[in-house]
Amino acid sequence: MIPNGYLIFEDESFLDSTVAKMNALRKNGQFCDVRLQVCGHELMAHRAVLACCSPYLFEIFNSDLEPHGISHVKFEDLDPEAVEILLNYAYTAQLKADKELVKEVYSAAKRLKMDRVKQICGDYLLSKMDSQSAISYRNFASCMGDGRLLGKIDSYIQEHLLEVSEQEDFLKLPRLKLEVMLEDNLTLPSNGKLYSKVIGWVQRSLWENGEPLERLMEEVQTLYYSADHKLLDGSLLDGQAEVFGTEDDHIQFVQKKPPRENVHRQLSTSSSGSLSPGSTKHPCKQEWKYIASEKTTNNTYLCLAVLNGMLCVIFLHGRSSPQASPSATPCLTKSLSFEGQPLEEEPDKLLSPMHYARSGLGIASLNDQLIAAGGYNREECLRTVECYNIKTNSWTFIAPMRTPRARFQMAVLMGQLYVMGGSNGHSDELSCGETYNPNADEWTQVPELRTNRCNAGVCSLNNKLYVVGGSDPCGQKGLKNCDVFDPISKAWTNCAPLNIRRHQAAVCELDGFMYVIGGAESWNCLNSVERYNPENNTWTLIASMNIARRGAGVAVYEGKLFVVGGFDGSHALRCVEMYDPVRNEWRMLGSMNSPRSNAGAAVLNDVIYAIGGFDGNDFLNSVEAYNPKTEEWSTCADAFTDS
């Protein structure tokens, strides 16, 4: 067909033929310009091909000081056969791996940020999983930090706990043995509330008493379950018992507020995802989670849970006489007889994740809903926008932005959303902006900034939009610039510059002042905070945060600032701080369940939400929420229905 006089021809065999020839060139070492050294094995390839398939290698090649020479990339913790399989995939789009190598291919794909391959390998493992391999697969998924894979494996274990508990891997797990003494005519409840109290007791023992988890497992621990459904420490039954939970506690397992001296210990925990295939020592994240439970015989219960990042069996045995001293606790053996009673309560309903993983996104609360816009999901810069309905615990799409953008912030001004600057994934910085009208469900352009701005803070104050700081054109250092947009005159003006250059700072309004929190001057993270007074157009340095951070989220609740997560120069952070402007001081709060840098934070219905971000390994679509009244973070939706 020749429309308009032009010849158009499509060779359907060209692509297959070309990639086959390119792969042959690779195997013969012809025209190769990159050498991969994997545990003593040398693999040759073409830089352009690998850069298209691996964002990790793209970043390395893009920063190569000698772009026209041969690149050398060294891996000491990957399987050479797995990397060769990924190279074949990069050239042929065909993934062929023996079942014994799938975990190694997954690990290599994770390191190279080949997310599609990682997902395919994960799905394959799920298809082969049975009761015998479930624990092994869960350990692997946990150490890889794959929330999607973990969720599916945990669902399988919940449905097949009886069969799983009879397998060797399960029987080798660390075991916490609890003797729970009961008042007369009481039985232990077969539901999650009991295990919530138990996990709370373990956390308290570790964090307040400094008791190592291993020591708690050395001997039987005695607790007391009273008639009013309180779980008490059995060693304190002489009238000084401490209550560890009540019947109306939420069924949730969250990281409790640690003592001040433990904060720095938590921050130093590595969340690296670099794993050596076949290694048994993987750096797993700290986690507290109830997975599954079953009632066995004679008031005995079995629970699988994660305690401080360790997969454990909690074995509970109830005795009817509180005064009796337990002489023994039944041991879990392969011959245990189960009654097979179902759980009396359904598993906790989690906060629904976004449709897309997003880091460097814009977050705002508008019309009793949370709005998440743009961001990176590793593969691309997004322009999609999602809306969270707290009543239905669901995310739906609204009109997408006109321009893909990430590394920006979003603000609400006069009932509309505003986004300014950022990056579109191709150009480092944007000067354009948009505003969203919720009534029309559409985005329209607003006058551009005078200069391109990426990683700038955005805030509404006195019916005007402020854009503060950001990166210079080279992205190497922060800016002091502060620009103001008037939505009535649609004009930009300048205001006083910051005292300190900042990019990736958290920005918000509180009580008629604008706060600019943390960020980085160049690559050095800041803990300093500045406050802007629009009455006299001045910036004042106020009390500094406890932890220097950039890429943190910030939210305002009841006259205080809450700063969540961020990056300290080495690690994505879990820690949270609160600023009291009356006292001009910062206080550490309970940490989030996941580390999050470049996440969004917003308040809805008296609850602070942390959304998306990057945990040091993966881009996140997950959501967790903080109840300021209880000072606890949770991923459980039901925990906030009455908030």
Swiss-Prot record:
Broad class of where this protein is predominantly found: cytoplasm
A GO term, aspect molecular function: ubiquitin-like ligase-substrate adaptor activity
Region span, Disordered: 257-282
Keyword Repeat: yes
Domain BACK: 134-185
GO CC terms in record: Cul3-RING ubiquitin ligase complex; cytoplasm; cytoskeleton; nucleus
Domain called BTB: residue spans: 32-99
GO biological process: proteasome-mediated ubiquitin-dependent protein catabolic process
SS bond list: none
Leader sequence residues: none
Domain of life: Eukaryota
Extent of Low complexity compositional bias: 267-280
Keywords: Cytoplasm, Cytoskeleton, Kelch repeat, Nucleus, Repeat
Transmembrane residue ranges: none
CDD domains for this protein: BACK_NS1BP_IVNS1ABP (cd18502), BTB_POZ_NS1BP (cd18306)
Residues in Kelch repeats: 369-415, 416-463, 465-512, 513-559, 560-606, 608-643
Cell compartment(s), UniProt: Cytoplasm; Cytoplasm, Cytoskeleton; Nucleus
Stored SMART domains: BACK (SM00875), BTB (SM00225), Kelch (SM00612)
Pfam families from the UniProt entry: BACK, BTB, Kelch_1, Kelch_KLHDC2_KLHL20_DRC7
Family annotation (InterPro entries): BACK, BTB-kelch_protein, BTB/POZ_dom, Kelch-typ_b-propeller, Kelch_1, SKP1/BTB/POZ_sf
PANTHER family: INFLUENZA VIRUS NS1A-BINDING PROTEIN, KELCH PROTEIN
Protein's job: Plays a role in cell division and in the dynamic organization of the actin skeleton as a stabilizer of actin filaments by association with F-actin through Kelch repeats.
Protein name, as recorded: Influenza virus NS1A-binding protein homolog A
